[in-house]
A protein has these predicted regions:
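FIC/Doc superfamily catalytic core
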Residues: 1-204
Length: 204
């Protein structure tokens, strides 16, 4: 078993925010089961997909994303339509996914990036970086270390005693730091954080 532990520090502010969020989640849970309110759950899913893809510069509006989920056609670039449709398919997998399974992570990436990139569903075998214009602001973990780094991260997630709110954030940060895929890291990482939180509280 790996002894890897991500470098993070719990501050009073983080603990206070975690307690506040946990209390809010409990209050929502006590008031009513979200799964018994399909319209609210559906609206939340639409907003999640829209906001996640907007970060990736997808230009579709919330109304257009809603229309696509309802099976309607929208006038938009085909790739952006595929991004939305793929994201809905990936989020539909959430109830069946194991947050500690690398195979499930690869499955999600394959669905999320189907038809959008070569090698969807596989870890990258080349270097990758995050750029602001022409400036490199982050270089991902060297490709030959990616499988080992992801294995260590998943082992940590499965064995940590950190609160799920903290663990999900640490996992997401480390996931993006490793940048295991050639593309689609952001949207896949956000979905996986949702999955970790769902394991804690189904309202996510």
């Amino acid at each position: 078993m790996s002894t890897y532990t991500p470098p993070y520090q719990l501050t009073d502010a983080i603990l206070a925010l975690s307690a506040e969020i946990a209390a809010t989640v409990k209050e929502i849970t006590v008031r009513g089961n979200l799964s018994a309110q399909p319209q609210l759950h559906r609206a939340n899913r639409i907003r999640s997909v829209h906001s996640s893809l907007a970060i990736e510069h997808n230009s579709l509006t919330l109304d257009q994303v809603t229309a696509l989920l309802n099976g309607k056609r929208v006038l938009a670039p085909q790739q952006e339509v595929w991004e939305v449709q793929n994201a809905f398919r990936a989020y539909d997998l959430l109830p069946s996914l194991d947050p500690y399974s690398i195979d499930d992570l690869l499955k999600v990436h394959r669905v999320m990036m189907d038809g959008l990139v070569m090698g969807a569903g596989t870890f990258r075998n080349t270097g990758v970086g995050v750029y602001a214009g022409d400036q490199l602001i982050h270089a991902g973990t060297p490709a030959h270390y990616v499988p080992e780094a992801m294995q260590q991260l998943f082992e940590w997630l499965q064995n940590t005693t950190a609160h799920p709110l903290v663990a999900s954030c640490v996992f997401h940060y480390e996931f993006e730091f490793i940048h295991p895929f050639a593309d689609g890291n952001g949207r896949t990482g956000r979905l996986w954080q949702t999955l970790i939180l769902r394991k804690w509280e189904p309202i996510f």
